[in-house]
Design a protein with these regions (language model features):
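Conserved motor-region signature of P-loop NTPase helicases/translocases
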Residues: 5-256, 264-268, 289, 295-304, ...
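Accessory alpha-helical DNA-binding modules that contact the DNA backbone or grooves
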Residues: 273-290
Length: 517
């Protein structure tokens, strides 16, 4: 048979063993065909079981049968060249190469995952501010008052402010946009902008700064379950209230949720006025009948109508997200009800999903609230395969090291190429796990740098961890590419960035504002 496997770089060891058993990859059987399509530089789903070492084994087994797509059709020539420079300098340096897979044998380098500069088709339109083209990459540098390193939280807070301020500045400037050769000009809009983050905490930091400046945004995560939302917990209380409308405690709990949005004054009035409370209970009794006769989805739609929720929610910040989550949960509940018997079974199902959201499927991932003109805050994982006109990467200097605390196990390579899970691991094995973390961070950095079409704004600064006063930037993906493993001080980091910018056309390094409004 003929098989075509896309995104092969995200294959797990078990999946590869299955493919290899069927097709015997190394045999190159002329009576069958197995086409493996993937970019190992974008293997970033280790948390889902993907293993780049499986890709590398397949690459070794198919030596001489490799085909490379060497032209970028997404980005401008200037941006592609600048990204090439980031990785080429590390690839050319003596050591392990840009992606930490290069080894040396008798003075000869062997690298199963080399960085190979790509060509660019380029774009006709230019991203401009006034008459000037915006540089392909802008590095915004921030250090403490004395030029020294900052703790992660402090650096994150300031760079989130700088990121939001730059976005506001561009959006408020009518001369910032995309110019075509024929004179056509499209002004920059919020939907043209994506901010890439690694964690929910980073997303919250930058969205808070955008909100303070009146810029609406949406957060898109590859793994955030709708069952972790406040709407899910509130909906659980509401289902209990509708299922037992004669239980005054359940009814009061349902009415007191953020989902219903009743003020403290109204809730106090309902607690003191039996007649008013009975009127609300009657609404729930009616909804209970709808649930029994037409199903949970019909009941929840009636809830929206009878309680006047959409208008109430949409008048507040975040209301569109609340409505989207509510409708998403209603759909999931309706699907689950087809396999469950009775209202209490459905309530128990929802409670279980809330307690264990990690067990969910892609259907449970939070949905985009609308196609409105919003700035997108996206995890790097979620951004893979996508493209955006302008990208912000405000926290590019940060990283999360693998430490003994919080690491219940590590995976250790074996002679046969497999990796063994160890619960009781040595310091050397822990160091290997952190090295693997850095390898994946480098690939995540590559994914982030290759998302924009026109321009990339990066926040950067000297970073310290814990009580140490020393810079640890070399342990991040972006820092390793600039310095290798050598630890250097804050002043030297700035000098290297300046030298890199001077040697790289269309890359500028600027001081981030020390104070941001």
């Amino acid at each position: 048979p003929v098989a075509l496997i896309d995104e092969f770089q995200d294959t797990s060891p078990l999946q590869y063993r299955l493919f290899d058993r069927i097709y015997r990859t190394a045999d190159n059987d002329p009576h069958s065909a197995l086409l493996l399509i993937g970019d190992p530089k974008q293997s970033i789903y280790g948390f889902r079981g993907a293993d780049i070492h499986s890709y590398l084994r397949a690459r070794s087994a198919t030596e001489g049968r490799h085909y490379v797509l060497g032209t970028n059709y997404r980005s401008t020539k200037e941006l592609v060249h600048a990204v090439n420079q980031w990785f080429a300098q590390a690839e050319q340096r003596a050591g392990e190469g840009a992606f930490l897979f290069q080894t040396w044998k008798e003075g000869v380098a062997q690298n199963p995952l080399p960085f190979e500069p790509v060509h660019a088709r380029g774009r006709t339109e230019r991203f401009v501010a006034g008459e000037q083209r915006v540089p392909a990459i802008t590095l915004a540098w921030h250090a403490d008052e004395d030029g020294g390193p900052l703790a992660s939280q402090d650096l994150q807070r300031h760079l989130a402010q700088c990121c939001a301020e730059q976005i506001v500045q561009w959006l408020n400037d009518a001369s910032v946009g995309f110019a075509e050769p024929d004179g056509t000009f499209d002004r920059l809009r919020p939907r043209d902008i994506a901010i890439l983050v690694r964690t929910g905490r980073e997303a919250t930091a930058v969205r808070r700064q955008l909100q303070r400046r009146g810029v609406a945004s949406v957060y898109l995560s590859d793994k955030e379950s709708v069952f972790t939302s406040s709407e899910a917990q509130d909906l659980l209380y509401w289902l209990r209230a509708v299922a037992t409308p004669l239980d005054s405690r359940a009814v009061r709990a349902g009415l007191a949720t953020r989902l219903m949005g009743l003020s403290l004054e109204v809730l106090a009035f309902l607690a003191a006025d039996d007649e008013a409370f009975d009127d609300q209970s009657e609404v729930l009794r009616t909804l209970h009948v709808v649930w029994q006769r037409q199903g949970v989805l019909a009941m929840l739609r009636q809830t929206l109508h009878r309680m006047g929720l959409p208008a109430r929610w949409l008048s507040d910040v975040g209301g569109e997200r609340r409505l989207t989550n509510f409708l998403h949960l209603a759909e999931l509940l309706q699907n689950a009800s087809a396999e469950l018997e009775g209202e209490q079974s459905l309530i128990r199902w929802l409670s279980t999903q809330i307690q264990a959201p990690g067990a969910g499927t892609d259907e449970q991932v939070v949905r985009l609230e609308s196609d409105a003109d919003l700035v997108k805050v996206v995890t790097v994982h979620k951004s893979k395969g996508l493209e955006y006109p302008v990208v912000f990467l405000p926290f590019s200097a940060d990283f999360r090291a693998v430490e003994r605390r919080g690491t219940p196990f590590v995976r250790v390579p074996q002679v046969d190429g497999e990796r063994e899970l160890r619960l009781d691991y040595s310091d050397e094995e822990l160091a290997y796990a952190d090295r693997e973390r850095l390898r994946e961070d480098l690939r995540l950095f590559y994914v982030a740098l290759t998302r924009p079409r026109h321009a990339l704004w990066m926040g950067w600064g000297p970073l310290r961890k814990g009580n140490s006063k020393s810079c640890v930037n070399e342990r991040s993906g972006s820092g390793y590419l600039l310095s290798g493993d050598a630890p250097i001080g804050a002043a030297e980091w700035r000098s290297r960035l300046d030298a890199f910018a001077e040697a790289t056309p269309d890359l500028q390094c600027l001081n981030a504002p020390s104070t941001v409004g």
